[in-house]
Each structure stands twice: as structure tokens, then as C-alpha cells.
Amino acid sequence: NTYLGFQSSIYVNSTWYNQTCNQSHYVHRLHRDYDDFKFLGITIYWNDVKEQNAPLGFVKKSHTNPNIVEPVSILTGSAGTVLITDTFALHKGYPALKERYTSSIRFGKLFNAATVINGFLKS
């Protein structure tokens, strides 16, 4: 927990299947995730992810410097690739021209904007 600076918990644990959308014009805009003031994500690619498999686009070092907005690095990898990310950094998704299987785990405070509604944990 050195990066986060506090004792963290897993607050998201999910598996994703992105099926083919055949819309090459579909791209998410660059954005930041605002789950909490500090959090860390791990993504595992379960199949080879190339530019056609909805890779993650990421602007390196933009989590600590808000003036950095480019270039966007496309994070491809072979099956078993593990990405460790701080998605407060600018990032975006690309279209799934071929299917993609991933798992996502997020570490942070258990009680944060992604897990709490009106003071109660989301179920």
C-alpha cells in the first residue's frame, strides 16, 4: 500500500466480455475516473488484445500533471498481460472490432464514491 499511502481494500472485482461492435468510429473521449482521492486498478487481458480488441488508451503521467493531455498510448498485450493503472490519469476506450476478455480489480478505500450511495454501501 505504499503507492496509495493507506490500508486499502478491493472494492471492485469484475470480469468483462467486450463483444464486437463493428463501429470503427466508436471511441470514448478522454476522461478521468473519480472513485476517490486515491485508488489503483489492475486489469488482466485473458486473450490477446491488439488495436482491434478494444485496448485501453492512456496518457502517461497525467494522473500527477493535469497539463499533460497527449500523446495517448494504446495498451495492447498478449493473453495474461497485467496492467497496473491509476485511472485518475486521462484514459479512453477504443471500439471492439474483435472480442476482448478482461478482469478488473480496484484497490482503494472501501467507502468511496464508487461504492457508497447516501452513506450506504452499494449492493
PLM features per residue range, with description:
Residues 13-15, 42-44, 103-107:
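A structural signal for short, well-ordered beta-strand segments
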Residues 21-76, 82, 112-121:
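Catalytic core of non-heme Fe(II) oxygenases with the double-stranded beta-helix
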Residues 1-15, 30-31:
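Signature of the catalytic double-stranded beta-helix
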